[in-house]
Structures are given as C-alpha cells and as structure tokens.
Amino acid sequence: WIESIQLTKGTGSVVNGFESIAGQINVELKKPESAEKLLGNIYVNDQGKTDLNLNVATKLNEKWATALLLHDNFMNNALDMNMDGFKDMPTGNTFSLVNRYKYDNSNGVLAQFGVKVLNDQKVGGETSFNENSDKYTQNRYGLAINTQRYELFGKLGYVFPQQKFKSIGLQFNASDYQQASYFGLTNYNANQQSFFTNLIYQSIINSTIHKFRTGFSFQYDKYNEDYNLNSYVRKEIVPGTFFEYTYTPNDQWSLVAGIRGDNNNIYGSFITPRLNIRYEPVIGTVFRLSAGKGQRTANIFAENNSLFVSQRSLMIMGQNNSGAYSLNPEISWNKGISLDQKFNVFNNPATLSLDY
C-alpha cells in the first residue's frame, strides 16, 4: 500500500494546522495512475497468522484513474509459548479498504477523492477465556477491542495554465470512528465524528523567490465516550486562517515563516507562529533550524487504552462536566537545530544526522 513516507521534525507548516508539536508524518499510498495494475500476495506462518493483500489499479480513460487496495489478516490460534495461561498476542481479524479516484484534465484542473474502511476485532486475556460466559465476570480475565472506522476524503485544485506558480485548492475529510471495548470489568466505548476542510491559495510576490500560501480551515469534532458509569460528551468547532511566506534566494538558503489564528469554541482564540530555516553551504551538508508553537486537545482515554488492562480506576479530579474533561489544552513551544551530512562508506551512500 505504501509508496513513501515523509518525516518532518519540529512544528511543521501552519498550512497543515495548529496541532503539530514534535513533528509530522505523511504516508503516501500508491497512486491510481502509477500503481501496479494487479498485485496480490498471501502470507501464512506456522503459528496461524495469515495476511491477504490485493491491489488493483486502472486508467478508466485519459482523465480518470482509480485504485482499490484491500487487506485482511486474521489470527485464530491462542498462542501461549511461555505457558503462563495468557495469550501471547490477541486473536481476531482486521479488514481494511482504500478506494481512490483521480482526475486530471491536463489543463490545470486536478481532483482526487476516495473512501477508507477499517474493521478491527481483537480478543486477549487468558487462553481459557470465553466471551459468551466470562465477559464482565471474575471467572477468567479477558479483553476485547472492536473498532470500525469510515472515512471520505477529497482534494480539488486548479493550477493557472499561464501562471504555474499560482494555484488554489480545497481539501476535505469526513470520518466516523466507533470503538466498543472492555478490559476485565472495565468498560470503555467511544464514538468520534469529524470533519475537516482546508482552502489554500498559493502565489508569488514579484518573483518566485518570494512565495506565499494563505487560506482558511475548519475543524469539527464530536466525541461521545463512556468509561464505566461516566459519560464524557464534547463538541469542538475550530475555524481558522493562516498565512505562510517562503523565501528561496538560491539553492543554499530557504526560509519558511508562517502564522495562523484559530478560534476554539471551548478554549477561545489563539495564535500559532512557526519558523523553519534551511541552509546548505555545500552539497551534502544541510543545517536546519525550526521554532514554533503547537496546541492540541488530549483525548486522555483513547490515547491511554493500555492503562485499562491494569484494572486501575482513572479519576479526573475537579470535574465540572464542561470542555474536554475539564482540562486545559496541551500547549508546546518547540525549537531545535539539526545537521545532516551525506557521505559514502565503501561506495555506498550514508547519512549522519545530529539533532538538538
């Protein structure tokens, strides 16, 4: 499925939002116009784990292309190699699907949209655990996490034919996430409905040395969580605007400075500034400097499911049933510097990276 992975250290670009704190990971899936027409593989090991993959891609005509990516894996054997009475790994099944369509009229109009589906079911605990008779009892310990996620995404862009440096684009993403789980006597169920859209305009100031991107974004999240007998419901609505300036006088220097302003219906208005500088004095030696701010709302239960296994009770002190668990958002100021040096070792390329 994966064509490439890009890793960005530091706070990243304001165009992508305000939440990035330590870095960003962008995973590029195989594209409809360049993926294999047909690719399938099957993996089975002696422990019973089975993986099935099928990729199908085709060009429908000169303007349209589509790709279908399918994956299914299952593990039904309750392994207990160390004979402690507990499964060494969960049993269950995972199915995922991605279907993408891409449009290019060769005259500046580009479009892409698709769907993603995930259905994941996992059961762990004692090897003798039976969901039908032992669930929510002290007979035998067991846990299960059942997850369903559905996503619709798309991009629409226009590049001005006579001014290739100028473009306008719209991104959107809508998803529904549901989790039903239990960990021994602990119960946790969650539902998240999200919508995100980003309108981006890109152009130059006098010359391509001075580029800028600006636009508007809108984020909507609705959370409904049940932890044992407690319910946590919240809705976050965050409209925002941003401006980013890029200065590239030559191949050695580049500077990206950005600022965005957002308004969260729970936490109010806030500003997010960011700066990234790159300097390459000689080919193969690159210095990078970054600084900026990030802010996010922590989903304390969903991000710490592993704590439920211990059967400890999680208590939020001073609850007033408002906002996100009555807690403040996470806010971080991040700054760093790095050096990347490329060289050869026995005629093979290598890279040394130093970060602070």
Summary of predicted features, one role per range:
Residues 1-9, 97:
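Short acidic/polar hinge/loop motifs at secondary-structure boundaries
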Residues 6-7, 15-41, 52-55:
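N-terminal periplasmic accessory domains that precede
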Residues 36-37, 63-66, 76, 107-111, ...:
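Repeated loop/turn-to-beta-strand initiation elements of outer-membrane beta-barrel proteins
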Residues 42-46, 72-76, 103, 117-121, ...:
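Transmembrane beta-strands of outer-membrane beta-barrel pores
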Residues 63-82, 92-94, 98, 132, 167-176, 265-267, 279, 283-335, ...:
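Surface-exposed extracellular loop regions of Gram-negative outer-membrane beta-barrel proteins
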Residues 75-96, 102-168, 174-192:
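Flexible loop and strand-edge segments within Gram-negative outer membrane beta-barrel domains
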Residues 167-181, 280, 288, 325-356:
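Membrane-embedded beta-barrel scaffold of Gram-negative outer-membrane proteins
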